[in-house]
């Protein structure tokens, strides 16, 4: 039906007869001439109808936005004065000789000339996807997956599929369950990741595996989360953690070079402890120049319990955050930031405004100045590198609250004061995470997952001091987003059972849930390690949007619903009966 795409026509096509298929993007009727912008997935081209082709001109008068049409015509060069530098096809136009209206369009529920609500865009997603910016994002996504496949093939990885209907395992979020008709009362789980299957593939001898795979997690959603998402899943045997990172870093550098024309260079490597200490986050945005600076040793003897208490507590921390040019902040802005950090558990926000550093106490403005000596103030200013016109904010509490509160404040100030370089790419690896974290109920939970190996510890050493264990894990972070994470896996049965025991999984439960894994570990398991990238998040970064729904063709809302198909929906009673399922309605409170 077509010979060319609208958006691919150039001066090299001048004089050629072409047939185009697409949609009317815009129509301008000048009486004796009618111009339309015709659009397909590759872009837009100007088509015009003149009186010499009367039938086509007459039919063109009926055209409206989003009519689906076919046009045959001749490509012509535009006069110099009519060249449109804003269009890729702006040097040419098509003189139409024939027009076919394939399908007409009703009045549109989306307005191309105004900003539509996200609710409307999701309800009429098939129309929203016609917009050039949306089409470009999905084309970029397709390019990314193509580049990934070629790279992985070139590096000896095998694309192997793993099951969608599997067994529920504890991986940190709720599973989506699928009832079995054949085995009434039993359920499959949709995979949160192919974690155990890819480890079993390593045990099967497939030493380099990858898969671009759908995963499912029934969790509370955020702007960068979806209940179903796509992973670039990777596993290797006989490779160390640095070797895995080297290959995966090469993949991401390849993507940025091919898609953005940007060489990311070598990725710096930072420990979890350093990232938390300097940036208050395990996924630091290095485009932001501000850092947290420890000042507890300077404040242990001050007559101000808010500072002195945490400064003398081994579990406490007092940190300072220097804000370049922050002295300009108004009292209301400071109060707003004080309320902001309370979201993260902080009780408030002490500060020092540096007006003229050379004047000592007389050169600062601070509600806590009366508790500080000139020497202490000078030491704080020296350590933070404060200059005239800067602001210093303080966090004083337990270590987690200080990191969370000042880390979040750092990001907010970076954005509010334009301190974060939005034109920069800042990738890094974060390594050496704690193996476990407090579950809030007196027990421990795995910081990554229960199959991550500890660094340099035997099973008996791990059992004795699990709180001290460091995971042989690594996350790739770009511009403050965790785009991928992985680890060296446990390949020893004793170690795996030790980890399960620390997590409170008794031997009977281990056999019920992981018996197949424990059995497989008995038969010559190779050392193995892997990583998974979030394809949706990578695409989000590479297309410059901050909403993950913009890079998924048919995404869910933050309530995990599809507004277009109205999923989820109630099931047919006959189907439920066949599955042996009875829906119990909650009693309404009177």
UniProtKB/Swiss-Prot annotation:
PROSITE patterns: AA_TRNA_LIGASE_II. One of its GO terms (biological process) is aspartyl-tRNA aminoacylation. The keyword Protein biosynthesis applies. Residues 195-198 are annotated as: Aspartate. GO terms for molecular function: aspartate-tRNA ligase activity; ATP binding; nucleic acid binding. It catalyses: tRNA(Asp) + L-aspartate + ATP = L-aspartyl-tRNA(Asp) + AMP + diphosphate. GO terms for cellular component: cytoplasm. Its EC number is 6.1.1.12. Keywords: Aminoacyl-tRNA synthetase, ATP-binding, Cytoplasm, Ligase, Nucleotide-binding, Protein biosynthesis. ATP binds at residues 217-219, 226, 482, 534-537. Pfam families: GAD, tRNA-synt_2, tRNA_anti-codon. Signal peptide: none annotated. It is an enzyme of class 6 (ligase). CDD domains: AspRS_core (cd00777), EcAspRS_like_N (cd04317). It comes from the Bacteria. The keyword Nucleotide-binding applies. It is found in: Cytoplasm. L-aspartate binds at residues 171, 217, 448, 489. Catalyzes the attachment of L-aspartate to tRNA(Asp) in a two-step reaction: L-aspartate is first activated by ATP to form Asp-AMP and then transferred to the acceptor end of tRNA(Asp). Belongs to the class-II aminoacyl-tRNA synthetase family. Type 1 subfamily. Homodimer. This is Aspartate--tRNA ligase. It comes from Salmonella paratyphi B (strain ATCC BAA-1250 / SPB7).
């Amino acid at each position: 039906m077509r010979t060319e795409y609208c958006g691919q026509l150039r001066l090299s096509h001048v004089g050629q007869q072409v047939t185009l298929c697409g949609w009317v993007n815009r129509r301008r009727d000048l009486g004796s001439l009618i111009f339309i912008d015709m659009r397909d997935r590759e872009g837009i081209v100007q088509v015009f109808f003149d009186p010499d082709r009367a039938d086509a001109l007459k039919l063109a008068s009926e055209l409206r936005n989003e009519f689906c049409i076919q046009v045959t015509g001749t490509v012509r060069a535009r006069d110099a004065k009519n060249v449109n530098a804003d269009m890729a096809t702006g040097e040419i136009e098509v003189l139409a000789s024939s027009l076919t209206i394939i399908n007409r369009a009703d009045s549109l529920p989306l307005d191309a000339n105004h900003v539509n609500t996200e609710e409307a865009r999701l309800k009429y997603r098939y129309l929203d996807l016609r917009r050039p910016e949306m089409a470009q994002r999905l084309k970029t996504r397709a390019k990314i997956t193509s580049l990934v496949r070629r790279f992985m093939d070139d590096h000896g990885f095998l694309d192997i599929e793993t099951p969608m209907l599997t067994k529920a395992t504890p991986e940190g979020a709720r599973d989506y369950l699928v009832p079995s008709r054949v085995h009434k009362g039993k359920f499959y789980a949709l995979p949160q990741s192919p974690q155990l299957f890819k480890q079993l593939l390593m045990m099967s001898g497939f030493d380099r595996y990858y898969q671009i795979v759908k995963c499912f997690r029934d969790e509370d959603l955020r702007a960068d989360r979806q209940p179903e998402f796509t992973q670039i899943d990777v596993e290797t045997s006989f490779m160390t953690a640095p070797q895995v990172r080297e290959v995966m870093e090469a993949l991401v550098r390849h993507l940025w070079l091919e898609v953005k024309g940007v060489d990311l260079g070598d990725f710096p490597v930072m420990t979890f402890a350093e990232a938390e200490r300097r940036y208050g986050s395990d996924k630091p945005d290095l485009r932001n120049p501000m850092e947290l600076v420890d000042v507890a040793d300077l404040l242990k003897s001050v007559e101000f319990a808010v500072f002195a208490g945490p400064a003398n507590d081994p579990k406490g921390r007092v940190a300072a955050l220097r804000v370049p040019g922050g002295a300009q902040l108004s009292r209301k802005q400071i109060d707003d930031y004080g309320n902001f950090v309370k979201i993260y558990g902080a009780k408030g926000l002490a500060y020092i405004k540096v007006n003229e550093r050379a004047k000592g106490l007389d050169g600062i403005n601070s509600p806590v100045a009366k508790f500080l000596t000139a020497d202490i103030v000078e030491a704080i200013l020296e350590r933070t590198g404060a200059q005239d016109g800067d602001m210093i904010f303080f966090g004083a509490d337990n270590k987690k609250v200080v990191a969370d509160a000042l880390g979040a404040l750092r990001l907010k100030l970076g954005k509010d004061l334009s301190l974060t370089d939005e034109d920069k790419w800042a990738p890094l690896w974060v390594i050496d995470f704690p193996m476990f974290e407090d579950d809030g109920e007196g027990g421990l939970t795995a910081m990554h997952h229960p199959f991550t190996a500890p660094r340099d510890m035997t099973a008996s050493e791990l059992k004795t001091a699990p709180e001290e264990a460091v995971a042989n894990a690594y996350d790739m972070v770009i511009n403050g987003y965790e785009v991928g994470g992985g680890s060296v896996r446990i390949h020893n049965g004793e170690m795996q059972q030790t980890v399960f025991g620390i997590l409170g999984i008794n031997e009977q439960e281990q056999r019920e849930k992981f018996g197949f894994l424990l059995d497989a570990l008995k038969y010559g398991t190779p050392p193995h390690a892997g990583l998974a990238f979030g394809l949706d998040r990578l695409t989000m970064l590479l297309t410059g949007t901050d909403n993950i729904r913009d890079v998924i063709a048919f995404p869910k809302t933050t309530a995990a619903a599809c507004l277009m198909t109205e999923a989820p929906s109630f099931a047919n009673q006959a189907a439920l009966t066949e599955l042996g399922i009875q829906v119990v309605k909650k009693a309404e409170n009177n």
